[in-house]
Amino acid sequence: MKRTWQPSKLKHARVHGFRARMATKNGRKVIKARRAKGRVRLSA
């Protein structure tokens, strides 16, 4: 059985990237929460 994590920067960005987050209401909530917490990296 192959390993479950087969990294792809493009796939990762499409699901977890900044634009993906901003595309939905809940995604914007995630960014807002991370800003409030003072995270240096807001998204992938």
From Swiss-Prot:
Q: Which GO terms describe its cellular component?
A: ribonucleoprotein complex; ribosome
Gene3D superfamilies hit by this protein: 1.10.287.3980
GO biological process terms on file: translation
InterPro entries, per the entry: Ribosomal_bL34 (IPR000271), Ribosomal_bL34_CS (IPR020939)
Molecular function per GO: structural constituent of ribosome
Keyword terms, alphabetized: Ribonucleoprotein, Ribosomal protein
Q: Which family does it belong to?
A: Belongs to the bacterial ribosomal protein bL34 family.
| Descriptive protein name | Large ribosomal subunit protein bL34
